[in-house]
């Protein structure tokens, strides 16, 4: 079971996020906090796997919270769920190591994708013993990039059936 906290100052949004998290039985929301300042003491004594974090919270914003988290030596994964969409803010948060970033409003399916990515990465790292090779690291990064699993697109006017027929023809007519 993954232990989750939510840092969100809007009670309605916090409640929705909690419901979204708990749809998946692997996750349990242990606490909801209105700001990062309230959450830090809790995090120092309670192991937490994942934080759902809003950027715009009172007392300290999401970036300040991530700095405080790092300074305390705490390393839970963080999914931003926020209305903050300014390029500088997004860049700053990415540089602080967030796991995913959802801009409000969003669909449940996007939230679920973020949780699935977290779970997949966490499980992969838990089952990897020793050092990771380049292939392993590529797999970790492809978890966060759906394009890595996508098939290359075919040229316009070419589909899988036609391509298979061409391959078969070439194989049968090798000289």
Located regions from the model:
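Acidic, metal-coordinating helix/loop segments flanking the phosphotransfer/catalytic sites
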Residues: 32-50
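Conserved acidic carboxylate
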Residues: 8
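Active-site residues of response regulator receiver
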Residues: 54-55, 82
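Short amphipathic alpha-helix used as the core "switch/output" element in two-component signaling
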Residues: 63-74
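C-terminal output helix
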Residues: 106-115, 130-136
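Acidic catalytic/metal-coordinating carboxylates
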Residues: 35, 61-64
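C-terminal output/effector regions of signal-responsive regulators
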Residues: 135-175
